[in-house]
Design a protein with these regions (language model features):
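Structured adenosyl-cofactor binding patch, chiefly the S-adenosyl-L-methionine
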Residues: 97, 138-142, 153-169, 226-265
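Active-site/ligand-binding-proximal alpha/beta "capping" segment
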Residues: 194-242, 248
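Short, hydrophobic beta-strand segments that form beta-sheet elements in well-ordered domains
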Residues: 38-40, 57-63, 174, 192-197, ...
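N-terminal positively charged helical leader segments and presequences
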Residues: 1-90
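Short beta->alpha connector loops at strand-helix junctions that form conserved
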Residues: 78-79, 124, 150-151, 173, ...
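RNA substrate-binding interface of SAM-dependent RNA methyltransferases
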Residues: 7, 99, 103-104, 109-200
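Amphipathic alpha-helical repeat scaffolds
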Residues: 42, 127-135, 246-252
């Protein structure tokens, strides 16, 4: 229902409308921190939000696009130019949702139920939002309990990361931890904790992945810190059969998640 008290969508055509500036700020980390909101583009991602019982604060709809792709407090018809201005894309998706970020208190490690899922993913200091988004998508595909971001991580709710998740951001809980908090979690983890490293002592295919398994991965450039590596019960490697020395973060995460899923069937 709009400010007039009816269900007719509002319309915004002017690029100087204050709401355009307000939503454009959500492209920056500072803007998301201040507003505690994030953007999600496209009918597919918004359908995933609806399936996961999320409700948008705002739904912006381009001319000719369907309304009602996700439950929303307000629906606003906008021009393609307005969507371009907000998203920074030349060919934006015709749907743009604005969502409140999850309550931080519900996503701290104290709220994590280790036995609530057979596998979990911990990533230390991921920097690339596209890679992180792909990891979140793989976590969703393998029914992981959640993704724990350790240390100086990129923002999981940036428009680039949300885009890369293809809607999985709405299905996978995201937790944040300091390195010390992560070490404490691993020390009391009730199942197996498996670190990944090029010089791991065992091939990943030889691991039983006792549930609940925590998979612990570092970045391709820096690898996993010795502190987190030392806190894990196993250190596994992926065989490099060609000239490549490593695979990127998202590929490694996908391989290990599916290896754990297969072992735990």
């Amino acid at each position: 229902m709009n400010a007039s008290g009816n269900d007719t969508p509002q319309r915004i055509e002017s690029l100087s409308n204050p709401l355009v500036k307000e939503l454009r700020a959500l492209r920056s980390h500072k803007g998301r921190i201040e507003q505690r909101r994030f953007l999600a583009e496209g009918e597919r991602s918004l359908a995933e939000a609806a399936a996961a019982r999320w409700r948008a604060e705002l739904l912006l709809v381009a001319p000719g696009a369907a309304h009602g792709v996700v439950p929303a407090d307000r629906t606003i018809d906008v021009t393609i130019e307005v969507l371009e201005k907000i998203t920074g894309r030349d060919n934006p998706q015709p749907h743009l949702g604005v969502f409140a970020e999850p309550d931080a208190s519900a996503r701290n490690l104290g709220a994590l139920n280790a036995r609530g899922a057979a596998r979990w993913l911990m990533i230390e200091a991921p920097r690339d939002p596209g890679n992180l988004g792909s990891c979140i998508r793989s976590a969703d595909a393998t029914a992981a309990g959640g993704v724990i971001l350790v240390g100086d991580a990129c923002d999981a709710y940036s428009i680039e990361c949300v885009r890369a998740t293809m809607g999985s951001i709405f299905a996978v809980p995201i937790y944040h931890a300091t390195r010390d908090e992560a070490v404490t979690l691993l020390a009391r983890w009730p199942g197996e904790s498996v670190a990944t490293a090029a010089d791991g002592s065992v091939d990943y295919a030889e691991i039983g992945f006792t549930a609940p398994t925590m998979l612990v991965i570092g970045t391709e450039a820096e690898g996993l810190s010795s502190v987190l590596r030392g806190a894990c019960t196993r250190v596994a490697r992926l065989p490099m059969l060609g000239r490549a020395e490593s695979v990127n973060l998202a590929v490694a995460a996908g391989i290990f998640l599916y290896a754990a899923e297969r072992a735990q069937r």
